[in-house]
Amino acid sequence: NSESKYDKKISASAFTDYVSCSLKFFFGKIAGLAEPKDLPDEIGPHTVGTMLHTVMESFYRDSIGKEVTADYIRQREKLLPAMSKAAMIQELKLNPDYEYLQSALQQIIIKVIEQYALKVLRHDEQIAPFIIKELEDREAYTPLFSIEVEGREEQVRLMGIIDRVDIHQNKTRIVDYKTGKDQLRYGDFEGLFDEEAKGQNKALLQTLFY
């Protein structure tokens, strides 16, 4: 089957791994050696980021294809505590049917996710109205991309799972939620693809990938 060899796809994060450290890409994507997950009593940046993505998808899920106004956002902000709690339960694999007394750490997690989500929504309020086109679409962006390997043409399947695609003032925007402190500037274009360069801008690489 000619399509079967393209079942494995290169995502934006895999692409940035390859550019920043080809050895890390080999161990993770070729050799299949996954990075250790956060310990149960430790909440790492990746876990926080995943929970924020879950909350934002829940917040806008019913708005796909519709115009989102600032009033609509403000009215739904009261749902953030419940959405943040649900995201934590899902990510930490807690029992959703058990009304447990939340630990101090769990309360802090919920509050942190709320604050991250509010920061996104405050920005959304300022630019509203806009129309949500897609959220976390896992099927729409999987094109074949031609590359040259040892003098011959090969193809790889790319995969882009974009957090949000919306339309604002007749322009299509790609929105990628971040919980870290990503740089908005870069030096030279070639330096973005040099794994020995200092301070590689992974957020910009992902944007170019999309």
Model-flagged regions — what are they?
Residues 1-58, 155:
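C-terminal, charged and often intrinsically disordered regions of DNA end-processing helicases
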Residues 3-14, 31-42, 63-74, 92-107, ...:
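Glycine- and acidic
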Residues 7-11, 19-20, 41, 45-49, ...:
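Active-site-proximal structural scaffolding
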Residues 24, 33, 58, 62, ...:
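Short loop/turn segments at secondary-structure transitions that flank enzyme active sites
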Residues 51, 59-62, 174, 206-210:
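C-terminal substrate/ligand-recognition segments
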Residues 54-145:
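A non-catalytic, helix-rich entry segment at domain boundaries
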Residues 134-208:
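Non-catalytic protein-protein interaction segments used by genome-maintenance enzymes to assemble
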